[in-house]
């Protein structure tokens, strides 16, 4: 129950890794009923659409009706995040966030490589910031080293 988290002192709800807007709409509504901020994250595919097939324009239409406090793209490779953000950012005038993963899921486990080391990830994050993302972090495969690099750069 979200009420339990709110009663325990949660200050926001981050609902993440949605593949379509209907499931996100339910989550936002639940948070709003508790008068809590709702941060919502969607998973983009390589063409910038959600895994469920919706375009970013369709996401914006649905989210404009529901008003999340921050709209994120997450749990996808950096290239997919970029593709989604390039489509989303021009359409959304409220806070945007991103956090990519730097591995590949090969069931039953994740495989992490040096394809996106902390420095390369920082370069992607700079680009995302230039596109309009103001809340930036890391998902699966990122480590404290990645977040330290982000903190050092963005706190200058």
Language model segments and positions:
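Domain-level signal for soluble alpha/beta catalytic cores
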Residues: 1-156
């Amino acid at each position: 129950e979200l009420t339990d988290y709110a009663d325990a002192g949660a200050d926001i709800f981050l609902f993440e890794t949605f593949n379509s807007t209907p499931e996100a709409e339910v989550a936002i509504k639940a948070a709003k009923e508790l008068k809590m901020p709702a941060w919502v994250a969607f998973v983009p595919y390589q063409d910038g659409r959600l895994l469920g097939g919706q375009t970013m324009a369709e996401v914006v239409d649905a989210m404009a009706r529901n008003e999340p406090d921050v709209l994120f793209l997450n749990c996808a490779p950096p290239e997919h995040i970029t593709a989604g953000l390039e489509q989303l950012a021009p359409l959304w005038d409220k806070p945007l966030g991103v956090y990519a993963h730097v591995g590949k899921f090969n069931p039953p486990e994740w495989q992490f490589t040096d394809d996106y080391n902390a420095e390369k990830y920082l370069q992607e994050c700079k680009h995302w910031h230039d596109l309009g993302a103001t809340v930036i972090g890391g998902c699966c495969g990122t480590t404290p080293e990645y977040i330290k690099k982000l903190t050092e750069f963005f706190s200058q």
